[in-house]
């Protein structure tokens, strides 16, 4: 791994020392470049990528992730992985909170895994996250029973704003993770626009997933630029070349998911744009891998290292 005195720290200190000599546009570019160069220090893995490996050997899988050079992991709020994560030398900044704590629709999640006790409410999730030193809670997915027309998303926006207010009071942030269906227009209006336009920016951020935005026909670069300052978290994964637009995640073929640098997402443009937009944490995720998920994670991290440092790291 690079030493602490990296190109990022050099550029940052240089920007301060020469602020009076450079035009503001140059300062902005240098700051973004410095942030991009530090991406590897804030790079993690979304554990859905290694879900089977985690079930078989939690400690071993987390150690393998750390050995690949990743620094963070993102997982569900419960059960807590804190001790195992710390033992592996990894960190957590964000976790997925149960969606039904916001929507109120527990029935939609029946059969999707163990549900938390009915006494466990959003305030409990916020308290747990705060106690663990986390920074963000993420609403990661809506079951089909939780979706609907635009009025449903307007109601969800109000619920998210309320949840975000509780997070803000606790010193946390709330982010919404969009898949593809949120980008499909309903009567000319996209649900993602409703969720973001009808919630205050300081109460709800976006966890942008480059794959799902791309497969929905969106440009991830334009998305992160449009919502600059509101995208603290991103999921990085690539979309196989020639994959058509698809809004239904259940109909996306497994082979559409591929390692970073092997698909259509333009990461050479996305990473600088994300840095400039203020993205704080980056999580590599690959829903399906043709081989070992750990091999896929190795390939994707190397691609990111090549893009951000221009050399192997």
What are these regions (language model features)?
Residues 15-16, 23, 102, 106-205, ...:
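Active-site acidic/histidine proton-transfer and metal-coordination neighborhood
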Residues 53-64, 115-128, 216-223, 267:
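Short, acidic/polar
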Residues 42-44, 72, 91-94, 136, ...:
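Structural preference for beta-strand elements that scaffold enzyme active sites
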Residues 35-40, 63-67, 79-95, 123-134, ...:
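Acidic (Asp/Glu)-rich catalytic clusters
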Residues 45, 65, 73, 85, ...:
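Conserved, mostly hydrophobic/aromatic
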Residues 1-21:
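N-terminal secretory signal peptides and thylakoid transit peptides that target proteins
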Residues 168-264:
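Acidic/histidine-rich catalytic cores of soluble enzymes
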Residues 26-57, 63-67:
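C-terminal segment of N-terminal export signals and the immediately downstream linker at the start
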